[in-house]
Swiss-Prot record:
PROSITE patterns: MU_AGATOXIN (PS60015). It is found in: Secreted. Keywords: Amidation, Disulfide bond, Ion channel impairing toxin, Knottin, Neurotoxin, Secreted, Signal, Toxin, Voltage-gated sodium channel impairing toxin. InterPro entries: Beta/delta-agatoxin_fam. This is U3-agatoxin-Ao1f.
């Protein structure tokens, strides 16, 4: 009985690690697909690109002209 429980626990842990690794790889692939980014005051579109570079976020105060704005370290 202990052997069965141990085997189930080990299987669960192995599955959890495999799932975490595949999620991380998927996120890396998604980030790679985003392509080049645009800087401050450049036109952007979070849903389809172009995307803002790291340190900026896309704001749509005057839709459809969305621009990248500095996130000020948020």
């Amino acid at each position: 009985m202990r052997a069965i429980i141990s085997l189930l626990l080990i299987s669960t842990m192995v599955f959890g690690v495999i799932e975490a690794v595949s999620l991380e790889e998927g996120l890396k692939i998604f980030e790679g697909e985003r392509g080049d980014c645009v800087g401050e005051s450049q036109q952007c579109a979070d849903w389809s690109g172009p995307y803002c570079c790291k340190g900026y976020y896309c704001t749509c105060r005057y839709f459809p002209k969305c621009i990248c704005v500095n996130d000020n370290g948020k």
